[in-house]
Amino acid sequence: MSGLGIMVLTLLLLVSMATSHQDGRGKQATQRDAINVRRRRSITRTEACYEYCKEQNKTCCGISNGRPICVGGCIR
């Protein structure tokens, strides 16, 4: 095989490796965004629980079946 053929094959290999590496970054960014959305939702639920229980002069001890658990004091 000529030197030019080897150079072309090497170039194709490098391009395919670079492309697959960039695809991996895109997947990581998508996963990171999904995790951030989940965290924001849980923070919102927790804040809503605290506000709901504060109106009843109780403490929010968590959420069960989508409903806040409000008691005088949490046991952990």
Curated annotation (Swiss-Prot):
In which broad location class does this protein mainly occur, judging by the first location in its UniProt entry? secreted
Give the disulfide map: C49-C61, C53-C70, C60-C74
**In terms of domain of life, where is this protein from?**
Eukaryota
Gene Ontology cellular-component annotations: extracellular region
**Which tissues does it occur in?**
Expressed by the venom duct.
Localization annotation: Secreted
Q: Which UniProt keywords apply?
A: Disulfide bond, Knottin, Neurotoxin, Secreted, Signal, Toxin
The leader peptide range reads 1-20
Could you cite one Gene Ontology molecular function of this protein?
toxin activity
- Pro-peptide region(s): 21-45
Anything noted about its domains? The presence of a 'disulfide through disulfide knot' structurally defines this protein as a knottin. The cysteine framework is VI/VII (C-C-CC-C-C).
> What family is this protein classified in?
Belongs to the conotoxin O3 superfamily.
Official protein name in the record: Conotoxin VnMSGL-0112
Q: What is the lineage of its organism?
A: Eukaryota, Metazoa, Spiralia, Lophotrochozoa, Mollusca
